[in-house]
A protein has these predicted regions:
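Active-site lumenal/periplasmic loops and adjacent helix-entry segments of GT-C-fold
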Residues: 1-90, 94, 99-110, 115, ...
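Hydrophobic alpha-helical transmembrane segments
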Residues: 46, 81-85, 145-150, 187-188
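Hydrophobic core segments of transmembrane alpha-helices in multi-pass, intramembrane catalytic enzymes
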Residues: 56, 117-124, 166-170
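Membrane-interfacial entry segments at the cytosolic side of transmembrane helices
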Residues: 75-77, 140-143, 182-188
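Specific aromatic-rich, kink-prone transmembrane helix
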Residues: 110-135
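Membrane-interface alpha helices of multi-pass inner-membrane proteins
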Residues: 144-160
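Perimembrane helix-loop-helix junctions
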Residues: 166-188
Length: 189
């Protein structure tokens, strides 16, 4: 252990001359190291136990929010719990391969790709669904734009592919919503 961040190449053991772009954007390892230093826990223990538990709780809160958004009518509100339970069963029983999102969420929670696939992308879709439900209103509420931005920033902090994927998803979704609204400048309102 060298007590430094991104100064030594983990593959060769030599000091790095400059920080590569891949690690410059994804700051989740730095945050994990900060939490480890502040709590006194080893970074491996921090990543596997407290950090993983918090991310799994956020994941299940995201599932409940998706159910609440999809079944927002009074008559459909009883299906929110059914949706959340079914999603939890699919998550628990979805461990059929090492590369499916369910395995990423429960077995490799601390990795940035798991957070991107299970929290950031569903959050972006959730906020796009919320924006699509405002078709009858004059304009999309500012809070939806803010939450889409937060989903994009958190995806960027987790993995560098999130820096491209979530903004592209948000722009594509807003483009579809503006076409449905027949207001081609609705994104800027």
């Amino acid at each position: 252990q060298s007590n430094t961040l991104f100064r030594i190449n983990p593959y060769s053991g030599y000091e790095m001359g400059s920080l590569d772009v891949r690690h410059a954007l994804a700051s989740s390892p730095v945050y994990l190291a900060f939490l480890s230093k502040m709590t006194g826990l080893h970074s491996l223990i921090m990543a596997h136990i407290p950090y993983g538990i918090v991310l799994i709780v956020i994941y299940y809160c995201m599932i409940y929010s998706a159910g609440h958004t999809l079944f927002d009518d009074e008559k459909d509100s009883k299906y929110i719990s059914v949706f959340a339970c079914m999603a939890c069963v699919f998550t628990i029983c979805g461990n059929i391969s090492s590369s499916v999102p369910q395995t990423f969420m429960l077995m490799r929670t601390w990795q940035g790709k798991a957070v991107l696939a299970n929290i950031c992308i569903p959050a972006a879709f959730l906020y796009l669904i919320m924006a699509a439900k405002t078709v009858k209103e004059d304009k999309i509420p500012l809070g939806i734009y803010v939450m889409l931005g937060i989903a994009g920033l958190s995806a960027t902090a987790m993995t560098t592919s999130g820096a491209v994927f979530i903004p592209a998803l948000a722009v594509g979704g807003m483009l579809v919503i503006s076409i449905v609204r027949k207001e081609y400048w609705a994104i800027l309102k």
